[in-house]
Curated annotation (Swiss-Prot):
Residues 101-111 are annotated as: Flexible loop. It comes from Bacillus velezensis (strain DSM 23117 / BGSC 10A6 / LMG 26770 / FZB42) (Bacillus amyloliquefaciens subsp. plantarum). GO terms for molecular function: ATP binding; magnesium ion binding; methionine adenosyltransferase activity. This is S-adenosylmethionine synthase. One of its GO terms (cellular component) is cytoplasm. PANTHER family: S-ADENOSYLMETHIONINE SYNTHETASE. L-methionine binds at residues 58, 101, 253, 284. The keyword Mitochondrion does not apply. Mg(2+) binds at residue 19. The gene is metK. Its cofactor is Mg(2+); K(+). K(+) binds at residue 45. It is found in: Cytoplasm.
Length: 400
């Protein structure tokens, strides 16, 4: 590798990873609530360990959800259906500890500071303040057709394929837990030129040999996913490098909602504000504003206004308007960053109520995001992945 080139690595995990089990359970409960109560306030946390699921958090809703039933159905869909896998949907214990949302928080969310002070009319604002303070990032680049960085895009596709070959009985000896990792080499112009390394670790039946796993995964997982032109004789493969991965899932490691925030976003390629997504309704700006920031960044790149774009939004609890908007195009912008911020303010309503309305976020759409990434998805229709504002942004920014 020449001195002007660099390597960058991102990872993903399968739906059977302990932390991802928790994300999916939390979002399954959220979706079940939103089906009958779109205005519910939900902050649902899940933890799993050997034979045990604990669901806790704050939920304010007018509907009823059978949480243990939802938990078991989710675990079953993932594939933990037999005790010998280390976790079983039918026999695991499910404990719940749910409270209502704090009245102090609800006061700020129900009526934004601007509405309480009379500085914005009822016609201007839906009177929803941010559910917490915080900063959120969104990112897009033109490395892939999904406008995502290549390392995380390939890592997700490998993880999804790992699950597909298990569920479709192509490789029936695989079990639900697994991880993937891709290292991409970039040239002096910051363009991806080759894959330097691929790492896959997958849980498996105890009687299968490492050689068979390595041969099968290369044929059925790596080759169908990774573009042939990015592979060369120096590409390194690490498939189950420990040699054995029989004990997995919650039996191998405890899991917790919100512990895979880099997998959920951009694989470390862009910055992260620290807030997790799963189990939170759209009044929580950790989730909704991160989706809005991706929506903004993707439309800027889709408009041809930048090759790479990172958007930061920041909020104060109980205040509707973002306290700051920042845009970084990494010297690839066709317009100044000040101009882009002006154009974004004119075309996107980034108040919590505005985001909810703009992206139609009071729907049960969240479980499908809880594994294989919240961004760059081609298999599901997610509103923040649309590029419907690209033309308007380009015309206003460039004066066309």
């Amino acid at each position: 590798m020449s001195k002007n080139r660099r390597l960058f690595t991102s990872e993903s995990v399968t739906e059977g990873h302990p932390d991802k089990i928790c994300d999916q359970i939390s979002d399954s409960i959220l979706d079940e609530i939103l089906k009958n109560d779109p205005n519910a306030r939900v902050a649902c946390e899940t933890s799993v360990t050997t034979g045990l699921v604990l669901v806790s958090g704050e939920i304010t809703t007018s509907t009823y959800v059978d949480i243990p039933k939802t938990v078991r159905e989710t675990i079953k869909e993932i594939g933990y259906t037999r005790a010998k896998y280390g976790f079983d949907a039918e026999t695991c214990a499910v404990l719940t500890s749910i409270d209502e949302q704090s009245a102090d928080i609800a006061m700020g969310v129900d009526q934004a500071l601007e509405a309480r002070e009379g500085t914005m009319s009822d016609a201007e604002i839906e009177a929803i303040g941010a559910g917490d303070q915080g900063l959120m990032f969104g990112y897009a680049c033109n490395e892939t057709k999904e406008l995502m960085p290549l390392p995380i895009s390939l890592a997700h596709k490998l993880a999804r394929r790992l699950s597909e070959v298990r569920k479709e009985d192509i490789l029936p000896y695989l079990r639900p837990d697994g991880k993937t990792q891709v290292t991409v080499e970039y040239d002096e112009n910051n363009k991806p030129v080759r894959i330097d390394a691929i790492v896959i670790s997958t849980q498996h039946h105890p009687e299968i040999t490492l050689e068979q796993i390595q041969r099968n995964l290369k044929e059925h997982v790596i080759n169908p996913v990774v573009p042939e032109e990015l592979i060369d004789e120096e590409t390194k493969y690490f498939i189950n490098p420990t040699g054995r991965f029989v004990i997995g899932g919650p039996q191998g490691d405890a899991g917790l909602t919100g512990r895979k925030i880099i997998v959920d976003t951009y694989g470390g390629y862009a910055r992260h504000g620290g807030g997790a997504f799963s189990g939170k309704d759209a009044t929580k700006v950790d989730r909704s504003a991160a989706y809005a920031a991706r929506y903004v960044a993707k439309n800027i790149v889709a408009a041809g206004l930048a090759d790479s774009c990172e958007v930061q939004l920041a909020y104060a609890i109980g205040v509707a308007q973002p306290v700051s908007i920042s845009i970084n195009t990494f010297d690839t912008g066709k317009a100044s960053e000040e101009k882009l911020i002006e154009v974004v303010r004119n075309n996107f309503d980034l108040r919590p109520a505005g985001i909810i309305k703009m992206l139609d976020l009071r729907r049960p759409i969240y479980k499908q995001t809880a594994a294989y990434g919240h961004f760059g998805r081609h298999d599901v229709d997610l509103p923040w992945e649309r590029t419907d504002k690209a033309d308007a942004l380009r015309k206003e920014a460039l004066g066309e």
